[in-house]
Amino acid sequence: VRRRSVLLAVPAGLLTLAGCGDDKSGSDKASPSKEPTSPTPSPAPTGKIVSGPVPPITSGEDFGDKPKIAKGAGKPSSDLAVKTVIKGNGPTTAKKDFLQVNYLGQIWSSAKVLDTSYDKKKPATFQLGAGQVIPGWDQALVERKVGSRLELAVPPAYAYGKQGQPQAGIKGTDTLVFVIDLVDRFNGKSSAKGDKVAQSNIDLPKVSANTDGKAPTITVPKKAAPKKLVSEYVIEGDGPKVKKTDALLVQYKGVLWKNGKQFDATYKRGELAQFSLQQVVKGWSQGLTGKKVGSRVLVVVPPDLGYKDEAKPGIPANSTLVFCVDILAVL
């Protein structure tokens, strides 16, 4: 729900991937709504993917463990090298999916670590094929199983090109090495994951708890709309609690309290929504803050926390809005 139409899509701008830097750079504090401070990677050639060479992982070999990677030996391949270290058994990734990954990246020739998510205790989330990460990632991470650990050797043509990334100490001749754990993937068929919560208040809308990727049903009671914000679990996930400064990846559906008519939904578009809680109407920012990732939440937004006396497409002025929101990930 955004102030000028219905949903504000926030560019991901993942500094840790589109522009690597060490932990002291503050990249882990970057807002997804901010512009990257690094140059956009050059388009990569579409070439073959080879199986090596890649340097050995010397410790932290299990999925989820922070790895230590040896210095590269000899000359790296000019092609994109990808080795499956651990093959997962989860769903298969596809272009336009949102991926959630843990990773560590370093320079082939020096083993200098550029960036890692393991120390931040928070996976990175980005969309495949949307230019949010270096081209080597966009190509290597398609058609992989969630639960897999991959090791990549990414030559300059698939990373930052001949210009390199001087701010991070990456020369135009540097091959980059990454270990990547594929934690999860999300797309237009994703749903909340968690425990169903009883909906016993007869004065509130009822939301279905289906998790098949189809739009939930929302049944609005023929009663007076609440004057205050309502935020209740339909499905309670087990992820971290959302902070008011977070940006989220969600599925949602919105209907009018007055007649139950749908005015917007991600499900009909077949794509997820991403937004910062600082850039949406107050009913969303207040209603989702403190809720757990993985949850489905019923949010009833009174006019003073929504669009007030301003009409929007499909939304009359002074409308009470009813949403169900699946919180899939924090960006």
Describe the predicted segments one by one.
Residues 1-331:
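Cross-family detector of peptidyl-prolyl cis-trans isomerase
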